[in-house]
Amino acid sequence: MAWSITHGAEVGHWVAPRVAGQYHAEMSQAIGLVREGKIVAGVIYENWNGASIVTHIAIEGRLTPGYLYVIYRFPFVQCGARKIIAPVSATNTKSTTMCEDMGFIIEARIADATPGGDLLMFTMTADKCKYLGDRYGKKCQSPASA
């Protein structure tokens, strides 16, 4: 079972339809997890403004500790973001549960902002991110240089 971390347009185009979004390589970054040659998870980062960055996450398999380290290291360490923002439809219970399990909190709720109803704005700050420490970082053998 071979795992690897990759980045680029292929990952972005894999994530976009799974999060009902789009990927624009010139304005975004994407980091993916590959298992036996197939992308099983991916993250798109966009709208970096010098303080915060928006993320969209798609998962079709299990995540590795090293991948979790990389996908949080990129915005917080490489970009220097103070906050990650993850917009999720309130009707998408799988994604809301995933965000909560990862440590995101609901910072805002925008009524009727998605076709299904409300839009939840999940956020995370570096000081609340459990994935940046040695527990996950030591398991990362090839940090993404995305």
Residue map of PLM features:
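Conserved catalytic-core motifs of GNAT/GCN5-like acyltransferases
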Residues: P87, I105-L119
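C-terminal "cap" of GNAT-fold acetyltransferases
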Residues: A113-A146
